[in-house]
Regions:
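Hinge/beta->alpha junction and helix N-cap segments in small-molecule ligand-binding domains
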Residues: 1, 20-21, 44-46, 59-66, ...
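Stable alpha-helical elements in mature extracytoplasmic
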Residues: 2, 25-29, 63, 67, ...
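Short, hinge-like loop/turn segments at secondary-structure boundaries
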Residues: 6-7, 32-34, 57-61
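Venus flytrap/periplasmic-binding-protein-like
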Residues: 25, 29-53
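Hydrophobic alpha-helical segments within soluble ligand-binding/sensing domains
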Residues: 58-79
C-alpha cells in the first residue's frame, strides 16, 4: 500500500486531495498513520469521518449562495455567461476527527484555534463508516 510506503519513509504529514478511491480506502489506512504519529490532512470532510485527522474543503453554503447569485444574474438579468467572472473563495470549512486528534496526542481546542483564522468554521467529527451511521447514533 502507498500508506505503508509513506510510513516507512517517515513522512511528517500526509495530504490527499478529494479522491473517491483514496476515500474508500481511508477506513483501512487511517490507523497506520495514527500508529506512526502522522497526521493525515484531506480535501473533504468525508475523509475525516473515515478516520483522517482533518478535512479542509469548500464551504458549500457559501458556494451555493454564490452560484445561485451567478445563475440569477445570467437568467434574470441577461448577463453573458462567457464574460461572467470565475469566482474563488479564500476560506473553507475544516472538519477535525476528534478521536484521531486525541490519538495523535493533539489537543482539539489548540488545533481548532490554529485553524479558525483560515476557515468559516471548524467542525468536530468522530470515525464512522458514513454520515448516516452518525445520524443513527
Amino acid at each position: 500500500l502507498a500508506a505503508d510506503a509513506l510510513v516507512a519513509d517517515g513522512v511528517d504529514a500526509v495530504f490527499t486531495p478529494t479522491d473517491n478511491t483514496i476515500m474508500t480506502a481511508e477506513l483501512s489506512i487511517y490507523e497506520k498513520f495514527i500508529d506512526a504519529g502522522i497526521p493525515h490532512y484531506t480535501g473533504a470532510d468525508s475523509f475525516a469521518l473515515n478516520g483522517a485527522f482533518a478535512g479542509y474543503g469548500v464551504d458549500y453554503a457559501n458556494l451555493g449562495a454564490k452560484t445561485a447569485d451567478m445563475v440569477a444574474d445570467i437568467l434574470l438579468n441577461g448577463a453573458d455567461p462567457a464574460t461572467t467572472p470565475v469566482e474563488t473563495f479564500d476560506n473553507g470549512t475544516a472538519t477535525v476527527n476528534t478521536e484521531t486528534c486525541e490519538a495523535l496526542g493533539l489537543d482539539f481546542e489548540t488545533v481548532k484555534a490554529a485553524m479558525e483564522p483560515l476557515c468559516t468554521q471548524v467542525n468536530e467529527i468522530v470515525t464512522a463508516e458514513s454520515f448516516n451511521e452518525l445520524e443513527a447514533n
